[in-house]
Amino acid sequence: DNQGDKVPDLKVRAVFEALRYVYVSNHQILGGSWGMHVIVPLVHQSLDTPIPGIDDGKTFGLGDITINPLIIGWHLSPEWHITAGLDIGLPTGKYDSADPTDSIGANYFSFEPVVAFTYLAKSGFEASAKLMYNIKTKNDDTNYQSGDEFHVDYLIGQHFGPWSAGLGGYYLRQTTDDEVNGKPVGSDGNRGKVFAVGPAIKYDYKNMSFMGSW
């Protein structure tokens, strides 16, 4: 719940396969390389809930696609790299306000400024962090406005030829209230916060990378 306590007998399981296409051009903007990306998620989701009126269920399908038409990367040295851009979330995933078990998408647009830092030593050691601030539009089906969120993805790992392995995770904190019909939800605006860490592995093959994390 929003106090960080477990909800008894509530279980949500989700597995994502995110297909990310990245294009980096030879054009320069503000001294950095211009590129773009598209992220297409496929989602396997199951829900077991004790909440009255909501049935257990499973679903699979296309999630909400993310596009970023403007990514700028600066390579300050062989070790230090910085990128900045604006991710735009599109409500492409299936959604049914009357059936949460069959809903994969969020049913709103999101706009997320992104700044990422990477340190990659000659020894293969890597430390990376990606800072984001997520701003959402209102879900018109429910008249629910989710609050803004600040979050950080991080990774510490080691490269071994085409392989790399390490620890990765994220920290998220909601900075503004959730609202329904223009009024805050509950006494605390239903503000959430999450911290997660787990193993991560990546394999690079030609112009492709395969990543897994838990």
Residue map of PLM features:
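Long, hydrophobic/aromatic-enriched structural stretches that serve as scaffold segments
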Residues: 4-68
